[in-house]
């Protein structure tokens, strides 16, 4: 059995990136919550 995490930069940004977060209402909510918390890094 292989490891479950097979890192891919393209897939990472497609799923967790800034533009994908901005594209949905829920994603924008996530970003605003992270801004409110004061996160230095908002998305992957």
From Swiss-Prot:
GO molecular function, one term: structural constituent of ribosome
Basic residues composition-biased segments: 9-19, 31-44
GO cellular component, one term: ribonucleoprotein complex
Origin: domain of life: Bacteria
GO BP annotation list: translation
InterPro entries for the chain: Ribosomal_bL34, Ribosomal_bL34_CS
Secreted as UniProt keyword: no
UniProt-listed PROSITE patterns: RIBOSOMAL_L34 (PS00784)
Disordered: annotated span: 1-44
Keywords: Ribonucleoprotein, Ribosomal protein
Family statement: Belongs to the bacterial ribosomal protein bL34 family.
UniProt protein name: Large ribosomal subunit protein bL34
Organism encoding this protein: Lachnospira eligens (strain ATCC 27750 / DSM 3376 / VPI C15-48 / C15-B4) (Eubacterium eligens)
Gene: rpmH
